């Protein structure tokens, strides 16, 4: 599978990245199939080869999260709606218990409203 990913280059603590198409099993800084752009996070400079990127995307290349973000900002792909964060099992159990208590409380209040108290004094 072809991946669109960032290839790091530059000096220590002054990294820049090339946007490349490469095989998903190759190393991050290995030899790419094609260079498709450039990104400098310090200056926010971005250069994209839009024709080549559209071609690779149409062929089924999968962008990484960082590349997807750059492509969304560049207008090459639509923004994706990311799923909500996965909550741990303990928090899910607590949420279920709290919801069950709320339902029971509401049911008890509804039952109390239905049965009026007998205040018939003669």
From Swiss-Prot:
Q: Which Gene3D superfamilies match?
A: 3.30.1320.10
Which BP terms from GO are recorded?
translation
Superkingdom of origin organism: Bacteria
For this record, the Gene Ontology CC terms, alphabetical, are:
cytoplasm; small ribosomal subunit
- List, alphabetically, the Pfam families matched: Ribosomal_S16
Checking InterPro entries in the record gives: Ribosomal_bS16 (IPR000307), Ribosomal_bS16_CS (IPR020592), Ribosomal_bS16_dom_sf (IPR023803)
Alphabetical UniProt keywords: Ribonucleoprotein, Ribosomal protein
Tell me yes or no: is Magnesium among this UniProt entry's keywords.
no
List, in alphabetical order, the Gene Ontology terms for molecular function in this entry: structural constituent of ribosome
Please give the family membership noted in the entry. Belongs to the bacterial ribosomal protein bS16 family.
Protein name, per record: Small ribosomal subunit protein bS16
């Amino acid at each position: 599978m072809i991946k669109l990913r960032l290839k790091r280059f530059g000096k220590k603590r002054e990294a820049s990245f090339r946007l490349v198409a490469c095989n998903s099993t190759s190393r991050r800084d290995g030899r790419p199939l094609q260079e498709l752009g450039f990104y400098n996070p310090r200056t926010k400079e971005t250069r994209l080869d839009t024709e080549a990127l559209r071609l690779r995307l149409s062929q089924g290349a999968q962008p990484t999260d960082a590349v997807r973000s750059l492509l969304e900002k560049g207008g090459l792909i639509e923004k994706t709606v990311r799923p909500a964060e996965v909550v741990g099992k303990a928090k899910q159990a607590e949420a279920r218990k709290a919801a069950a208590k709320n339902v029971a409380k509401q049911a008890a209040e509804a039952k109390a409203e239905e049965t009026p108290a007998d205040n018939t004094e003669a």
